[in-house]
């Protein structure tokens, strides 16, 4: 989503079983400084770190944001964050997996034969320049976020049924 400096509401969505070769398997915000993201379920999204721009390193898999462009940042008040920092509340983030590209495969997303643990990364800023501040939300992990006592962390939301996306890395 590249919304410019306009208000944008993202709400009441089920964003599940998506794959990105870079970041934000579920949602990726770029140049969107005025976003309210609420009442959404973001589950079972995967990032593979296989894009030319990812350098093989894991990135947030559920919701990812990044540095604002210089052109957009120049239009914002001086006290504005330098990344798209959405208002996040009343969301469920669960089982979003951030892979690492190693050789000819992806580690950390649960592929058959991968000895590495699954790397859960629900939300964050892809280039590490800030932290997101979700509130009143369920999350599997807090990586990339500011802790809030209003969040429920590590408690399975026990959805009625799940589906695991089948992923294969071809040589």
Residue ranges of model-derived segments:
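Active-site core of PLP-dependent enzymes with the aminotransferase class I/II
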Residues: 4
């Amino acid at each position: 989503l590249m919304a410019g400096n306009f208000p944008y509401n993202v709400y009441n969505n089920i964003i599940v079983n998506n794959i990105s070769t870079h970041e934000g398997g579920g949602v990726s915000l770029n140049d969107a400084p005025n976003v309210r993201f609420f009442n959404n379920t973001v589950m079972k999204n995967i990032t593979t770190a296989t894009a030319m721009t990812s350098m093989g390193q894991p990135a947030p898999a559920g919701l990812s944001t990044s540095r604002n462009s210089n052109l957009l940042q120049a239009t914002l008040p001086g006290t504005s964050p330098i990344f798209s920092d959405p208002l996040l509340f009343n969301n469920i983030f669960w089982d979003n997996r951030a892979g690492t590209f190693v050789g000819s495969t992806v580690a950390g997303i649960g592929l058959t034969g991968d000895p590495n643990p699954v790397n859960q990364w629900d939300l964050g800023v892809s280039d590490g320049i800030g932290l997101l501040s979700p509130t009143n939300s369920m999350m599997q992990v807090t990586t990339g976020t500011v802790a809030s006592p209003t969040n429920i962390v590590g408690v399975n939301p026990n959805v009625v049924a799940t589906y695991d996306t089948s992923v294969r890395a071809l040589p």
